[in-house]
Amino acid sequence: MALIRDRKSHHSEMSKCHNYDLKPAKWDTSQEQQKQRLALTTSQPGENGIIRGRYPIEKLKISPMFVVRVLAIALAIRFTLNTLMWLAIFKETFQPVLCNKEVPVSSREGYCGPCPNNWICHRNNCYQFFNEEKTWNQSQASCLSQNSSLLKIYSKEEQDFLKLVKSYHWMGLVQIPANGSWQWEDGSSLSYNQLTLVEIPKGSCAVYGSSFKAYTEDCANLNTYICMKRAV
């Protein structure tokens, strides 16, 4: 009987236990997650600039187009600076003064002008560079229509700015068929201390190149030309 009572008592105790609402304990993980995130944001970058942790941060990627644009801007700035530098050198060397005003005779040493509008005045001579291409005869006629003649070299010292000319232009120098000598438009003979003449076959007219060098050429060829006249 005692054994039966003990079993009933044990069964009663077990029933009471089953009647309890036994649920698994819940842990408040919000604070733990905040600590982990804070640790990630304050961690020092490791190798390759990556922060190691539960939430890895990707590497910073630079677009190729961004690099191309930066290089293009840098080249544009460099080109602009070079252009400004050469313009300053050109201005200082050529001194392209457009002479439209009379100056006192007493300042004859620095006198220049007057010249027609848009002509270059240098050492009391007026020059105009024409970009249209013509034959030698057409170029001569164009200069005559403007009361001028094709370029003549008479002094390296006074025409020093012409040494910077790079392209080829008709000048007022032609070969006389009778004796093969070279003369200027005004009939004066070429002096070889004025410029160096490089002769080629079948060339009876001359173009001015640079550094006081002239090259013979067929008069029927098309070239740009330079007109010149004395300033009044």
From Swiss-Prot:
Keyword Cell membrane annotated: yes
Disruption phenotype: Mice display no visible phenotype. According to PubMed:18394936, show normal development of NK cells, B and T cells but display enhanced formation of aggressive tumors. According to PubMed:19631564, exhibit developmental perturbation in size of NK cell subpopulations, increased proliferation, faster maturation and increased sensitivity to apoptosis of immature NK cells, and lower cytolytic response to KLRK1-sensitive tumor targets.
Cystine bridges: C112-C121, C115-C126, C143-C227, C205-C219
Topology feature Extracellular, residues: 90-232
An annotated Gene Ontology molecular function: identical protein binding
Domain of life of the organism encoding this protein: Eukaryota
Keyword Repeat: no
SUPFAM superfamilies: C-type lectin-like
Cellular component GO terms, alphabetical: cell surface; external side of plasma membrane; plasma membrane
InterPro entries: C-type_lectin-like (IPR001304), C-type_lectin-like/link_sf (IPR016186), CTDL_fold (IPR016187), NKG2D (IPR042169), NKR-like_CTLD (IPR033992)
GO biological process: adaptive immune response; cell differentiation; cellular response to lipopolysaccharide; defense response to Gram-positive bacterium; natural killer cell activation; natural killer cell mediated cytotoxicity; negative regulation of natural killer cell chemotaxis; nitric oxide biosynthetic process
Segments crossing the lipid bilayer: 67-89
Record's bilayer topology term: Single-pass type II membrane protein
C-type lectin domain residues: 122-228
Topological domain ranges for the Cytoplasmic compartment: 1-66
Residues with glycosylation annotation: N137, N147, N179
Induction / repression: Up-regulated in activated CD8(+) T-cells. Up-regulated upon lipopolysaccharide (LPS) and interferon treatments in macrophages. Up-regulated in CD8(+) T-cell infiltring pancreatic islets of prediabetic nonobese diabetic (NOD) mice (at protein level). Isoform 1 and isoform 2 are up-regulated upon T-cell receptor (TCR) stimulation in CD8(+) T-cells. Isoform 1 is modestly up-regulated upon lipopolysaccharide (LPS) in macrophages. Isoform 2 is up-regulated upon lipopolysaccharide (LPS) in macrophages. Isoform 2 is up-regulated upon poly(I:C) and interleukin IL2 in natural killer (NK) cells.
Keywords: Adaptive immunity, Cell membrane, Differentiation, Disulfide bond, Glycoprotein, Immunity, Innate immunity, Lectin, Membrane, Receptor, Signal-anchor, Transmembrane, Transmembrane helix
SMART domains: CLECT
Tissue expression per record: Expressed in natural killer (NK) cells, activated CD8(+) alpha-beta and gamma-delta T-cells and natural killer T (NKT) cells (at protein level). May be expressed on dendritic cell (DC). Isoform 1 is strongly expressed in natural killer (NK) cells. Isoform 2 is weakly expressed in natural killer (NK) cells. Isoform 1 and isoform 2 are expressed in stimulated, but not in unstimulated, CD8(+) T-cells and macrophages.
Illness the protein is tied to: Involved in autoreactive CD8(+) T-cell-mediated development of autoimmune diabetes.
Subunit-level organization: Homodimer; disulfide-linked. Heterohexamer composed of two subunits of KLRK1 and four subunits of HCST/DAP10. Isoform 1 (via transmembrane domain) interacts with HCST/DAP10; the interaction is required for KLRK1 cell surface expression on activated CD8(+) T-cells, but is dispensable on activated TYROBP-expressing NK cells. Isoform 2 (via transmembrane domain) interacts with HCST/DAP10 (via transmembrane domain); the interaction is required for KLRK1 NK cell surface expression and induces NK cell-mediated cytotoxicity.
Function text: Functions as an activating and costimulatory receptor involved in immunosurveillance upon binding to various cellular stress-inducible ligands displayed at the surface of autologous tumor cells and virus-infected cells. Provides both stimulatory and costimulatory innate immune responses on activated killer (NK) cells, leading to cytotoxic activity. Acts as a costimulatory receptor for T-cell receptor (TCR) in CD8(+) T-cell-mediated adaptive immune responses by amplifying T-cell activation. Stimulates perforin-mediated elimination of ligand-expressing tumor cells.
Note: Is not capable of signal transduction by itself; isoform 1 operates either through the signaling adapter protein HCST and isoform 2 through both HCST and TYROBP signaling adapter proteins. Some families of ligands for mouse and human KLRK1 receptors have been characterized being very similar in structure and highly likely to be orthologs. In humans, an additional distinct subfamily of ligands (MICA and MICB) differs structurally, having an extra MHC alpha 3-like domain.
Protein's recorded name: NKG2-D type II integral membrane protein
Organism: Mus musculus
Lineage: Eukaryota, Metazoa, Chordata, Craniata, Vertebrata
